[in-house]
Amino acid sequence: MRIYPTFFNIFFKGMDPEKAHHIGFWGVQTLRNVGITRALRKYFQPAPELATTVMGITFPSPFGLAAGFDKGGKGIAALAGIGFGHVEIGTITGQAQPGNPQPRLFRLVEDKAVINRMGFNNDGAAAAGPRVAAARADLETEYRGVVRPIIGVNIGKTKVVELENAIEDYLISTRTLTPQADYLVVNVSSPNTPGLRTLQAIESLRPLLTAVREEANRVSPNRHVPLTVKIAPDLVDEDIIEVAALAKELKLDGIIATNTTIAREGLGLTSDMTKVKEIGAGGLSGAPLKPRSLEVLRLLKREIGDDLAIISVGGVTTAEDVQERLDAGADLVQGYTAFLYEGPLWAAHINRGLVKLRRARR
């Protein structure tokens, strides 16, 4: 019996989604602070057989938490403690910023989806750096002798920075956060920062990724920090192929696909479309994104083969969804939106489901 969906319907369904998010995040942190997740580590920790090596890093599970839940690195160890094989924080920007005006987070409960126009609200790279360093030290101590959860850091452009100065803004985050990160993500695909998606164009993306790679190498000379780029599902296939070719050319370590979509039509939404239109602009995530996310994954696998890692995200809810992505060529899989609907046992359930699926194939 799954208790959390009932709990969600009673306590969270009628609550402002952003307030519910903060309460839920506080709850996960409290589970760690009072020692519950550590006491139940045997339950939450992924089975050893799920460990996988990607981009030269061993992950305890192929399933992790996508960027967006922990925007500032405040709950990395707590989230790692409930079963995620990796926790990707952010998006972090060079400067602290409040994000877009509220309300900016909306649920489409019937579709198990969310629309957000958060706008990279975060405390900035300078504040996030020490948090990541502390979390990394905690995890290295707590998981000594076993595969520890991995920390990804997702960086983006500060809203007030003009596009012509975007590279330097990304470099502020790069030099501050690379030494603490296990891997780095260049986010050029959020629809909620004006002009950001134009950086996905090859003529803009090439110098940006080149500069970030060089700076990451400079500030971390003794440890290779894998570099990935996160792309939008709204790119046409030809553009995705171009990005894949560029990633191979620049010897990136991976591609994360996909971010949220600005589309509303063709997603099979069952929610009241009048309500959807009233919500307005923002990126849609969750179950309706699954078909396009799978399409992009298969296209990327065809184009890059095993040359780069592919991290698939978008519409992932169940262990079967995760295994489907792995079977389609993903090296790692991420989720976020379903976490809001499924609750704190979600990652543990997925890891247990993956073990059952794999054992059934033997």
Place the predicted regions along the sequence by residue.
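Active-site glycine- and acidic-residue-rich loops that bind
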Residues: 158-170, 198-200, 204, 228-249
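C-terminal helical cap(s) of enzyme catalytic domains, especially alpha/beta-barrels
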Residues: 96-112, 265-280, 338-362
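A gly/proline- and charged-residue-enriched helix-loop-helix capping module
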Residues: 90-147
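Short beta-strand/loop segments at the ligand-binding rim of alpha/beta enzyme cores
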Residues: 56-64, 146-153, 218-235, 302-312
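An N-cap/entry alpha-helix motif that binds or orients negatively charged groups
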Residues: 2-52, 116
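Catalytic cores of alpha/beta
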Residues: 72-81, 235-249, 302-306, 316-333
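Glycine/Thr-rich beta-alpha phosphate-binding loop at enzyme active sites
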Residues: 36-45, 191-204, 248-306
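Glycine-rich phosphate-binding active-site loops on the catalytic face of alpha/beta enzymes
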Residues: 83-97, 188, 254-264, 315-316, ...
